[in-house]
Amino acid sequence: MKRAFLDNHYDSILTANREKILAGGNGDAFLEKALTDSRMALVVLIRIPSDAAEKINRCIDDLKGIEPNLYYYPAEDFQITVMDVLKGEEGRRIPPNINEYIRCIEECSKDISPFKVKFDGLTASDNAIMVRGYYDDQLMVFRQNLRDMLKQRGLSLEERYKTISSHITIARLHSKFQNPEKLLDFIEKSRLFGTMTVSKMEISFHNWYDTKKEVLSILEL
């Protein structure tokens, strides 16, 4: 995916939410029960390696000095959402035809080779802070192939929106930002978190915050 396209995407998120952030943002009421959240989803995702995670954690340490009361994701929950196959719904259970989904996803993964994702900079919405990710075309190919194959096989796809980014959500807002101007200054500074080679992806049944998860399959590329 071209860098300019993703730059525009991440920039537009921040621009659209700037005034909301300055006004304190819009808190996520569900965060009070993040550990027991039962809005479960079937997803394909990418876990983040330790070297990039360490750099992100150092950034989080700095963020805590500005906004100490945010919900900060632990390193083991850092992820790139490749595809929300079945969206997060309260009390959702693993579907009885899960093996059909797994076979479909596994077949699509065989059509791509390992690819790179570069983590460069931050962006933010009115209730979340994200690391910007820039990916090779292989990820775009996989996403479209999976959409097509699920449709061909009559399997439901509940993508909340057409996924085009490769961001990592690292923090979420409980109630109100305490220092929104300082936060925006921090987010807009240049920072590089490194590049990872994606050689495997994960099929997971997890909740909104990834605090409850069941790994259903590991896809080796």
Please identify what each model-predicted range represents.
Residues 1-221:
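Histidine-dependent nucleotide/RNA phosphoesterase domain, centered on the 2H-phosphoesterase fold
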